[in-house]
Amino acid sequence: MLIGITMGDPNGVGPEIILKAYRDDKLNQPFIVIGDYDIISYCNELLNYNINIDAMNILDLGILTRNELKIGQISKESGYASIMYVKKAVELALDKKIDAIVTLPVNKEAVRLTYPDFSGHTEFIASLCREKNYTMMLASEKLIVTHVSTHLSLKNAIEYITEDRVYNTIKLTYDTLKRFIKNPKIAVAGLNPHAGENGSFGDEEIKFIRPAVERARRNGIDVEGPISPDVVFLKAYKRQYSGVVCMYHDQGHIPLKLLDFEGGVNITIGLKIIRTSVDHGTAFDIAYKGIASTRSLEEAFKFAVKLVEN
């Protein structure tokens, strides 16, 4: 088994948390860092980690040097470098040279200075895999959620909801959960207050969500919904459900980050490759200060290993 870890934005916490996790022996399977050797080396020197960098498995792409760093800042150069690491990792995964990818955070604004249409890792990696039926899963020990839509405005996210998209998200969620949970049971959150209360506060539940749930049941999936959004996450937290299908980005992100901010893992499901990610950003404000937590990286790495093994 070999896990590829992309370095993330060089101006952020990515290099630091890779080094710290390696130093503390938190990554329990062979891995290769896809990034820039000189940046990793400089971070090691700056933070006095005294790690033998040459003992690490680093695929040096030679894109950025320490002299080009702008620590804690948005820059076109770092945005370009960070997305090149991702492209190389996907290429390696598609060629079966690595078994999974763990991505460290990029800065969307920095990436857009080179790729103006970039909306996030999830969509970018799916496009490289030429996959249209995919979505984002967030997972922690306390809660698992998936999303019908991800990086859309709230207005557009509501318009994006259809029976087919809700059904596909339920199916993707089920197919992923059953790899590591026996007989998973899925909840589907409503969109509107009280899940619309029979059309009193919107009809998306009647027109799209309930028909998708019924179709999933007919196809053998143990699923319930639509369930009022203000209670469904508590029920899942109490283990009444294995995971919750959410209608839009923040509906799923808020409860998971509230319950387990550092332990969350982002997984792109529906791809022909395995990709997990830390569930935090570049943290420019604390970059290269030696204080960034490695917990999300540890959890993302463990989840990638779990998916490879299952």
Predicted features by range, described:
Residues 121-124, 130:
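Acidic, PIN/NYN-like endoribonuclease modules and their adjacent C-terminal/linker elements
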Residues 1-121, 163-247, 251-266, 271-274, ...:
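Contiguous, glycine/small-aliphatic-enriched amphipathic segments in soluble metabolic enzymes
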Residues 138-160, 164-168:
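Ligand-binding beta-strand-loop-alpha-helix segment within the catalytic cores
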Residues 128-143, 269-285:
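Short, flexible loop segments at boundaries between secondary-structure elements
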